[in-house]
């Protein structure tokens, strides 16, 4: 199934989490391999919409907040390098809005 085209991707999820080096559970180094940095976070935002969100999603678990989904797909970065990624999304019960939750190497 496809998730809605207008699924919400909070810029803060990229600029305060995915693209920021962390002592534990760092996700920024993997994204940097393809050329994604804080300086071009809008490119990652655009690429998540254009390359990932249009792929088929698989339903995962149901939580008290909503239904979780995953999308596994290649992500081609600004340097032309392809990363295998697994993205997690959630459709909230209260709002009905589908949101980007996180990205995991695949």
Residue ranges and their predicted role:
Residues 63-106:
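Short, compact, well-ordered microdomains
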């Amino acid at each position: 199934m496809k998730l809605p085209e207008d699924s919400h991707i909070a810029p803060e999820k990229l600029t305060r989490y995915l693209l920021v080096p962390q002592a534990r559970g760092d996700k920024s180094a993997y994204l940097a391999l393809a050329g994604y940095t804080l300086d071009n976070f809008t490119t990652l935002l655009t690429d998540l919409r254009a390359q990932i969100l249009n792929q088929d999603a698989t339903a995962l678990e149901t939580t008290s907040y909503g239904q979780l989904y995953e999308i596994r797909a290649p992500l081609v970065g600004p340097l032309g390098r392809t990363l295998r990624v697994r993205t997690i999304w959630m459709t909230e019960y209260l709002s009905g809005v589908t949101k980007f939750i996180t990205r995991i190497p695949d």
